[in-house]
Amino acid sequence: MKKNKLFWILTVVCVLNFAAYLYFYPSLPDIVPTHWGASGQVNGWGPKSTVLFLAAIPFVTLILFEVIRKIDPKHQNFEKFGKVWNLCVVLFTVMMAAFSWLSELAVFGKLPDSSNLVSILVCGGIGVLFIILGNFMPQIKQNYTFGCRTPWALNDEHNWQRTQRMGGYTFVVMGIVLLVLAFLGGLLGDIATLIVLLAAVLGGSAWIYLYSYLVYVGKMK
């Protein structure tokens, strides 16, 4: 699909999403839930005007993707992995649009307070996203925006390919950890879940960075 066509299709999705927000906006109470803990319990509230900001995030995300692609110093390489980039844009935009409805679903009683459904939806959704991106990461070509962008990978094509391949494996593992956390978050509690989450994401990121450096110094054959 041509990128311009995809951009306008997603723009329509974002506009319809915002229009639906405006339709339900008068029915919302003055204070709405805005944050949930790992257990699924609401632990943050804000004025209902907050939901309008949430509704705008998908469109802002879409615009950022379009701008980033054009200003990247290696923007010509985006054509070489266009399908992967388009998939990323679609997944992020649609996911942000879906997550933006959590406050409304909670207000209208579609998200039970006693369940960890929000944790499953958010953490699980991000986990699936990581797994999908991990499978496609080896196809990403050198750029300054998308993929595992270490200094050594950006300066060497071979290092970039090796780093993206390892990054793909690592993202899949991190995605699996997030999927497990999605269903165990309610049992572990907010603090323990956050610790495991940070350990997985930061640890995975550190390993990718270290691996790229080891390839650079010739330690990884």
Where are these regions (language model features)?
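Active-site and channel-lining beta-strand-loop segments
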Residues: 22-52, 146-155
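Membrane-water interface of transmembrane alpha-helices
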Residues: 23-28, 60-72, 132-148, 211-217
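Small-residue-rich transmembrane alpha-helices that serve as helix-helix interface/gating elements
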Residues: 123-125, 193-208
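Alpha-helical transmembrane segments
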Residues: 10, 44-59, 116-133, 199-200
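Alpha-helical transmembrane segments and their helix-start/interface "positive-inside/aromatic belt" motifs
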Residues: 1-12
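Select subsegments of transmembrane alpha-helices in polytopic membrane proteins
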Residues: 6-7, 53-55, 64-66, 85-95, ...
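Ordered, amphipathic secondary-structure segments that act as subunit-interaction surfaces
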Residues: 67-116
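Short membrane-interface loop/juxtamembrane segments of multi-pass integral membrane proteins
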Residues: 150-166
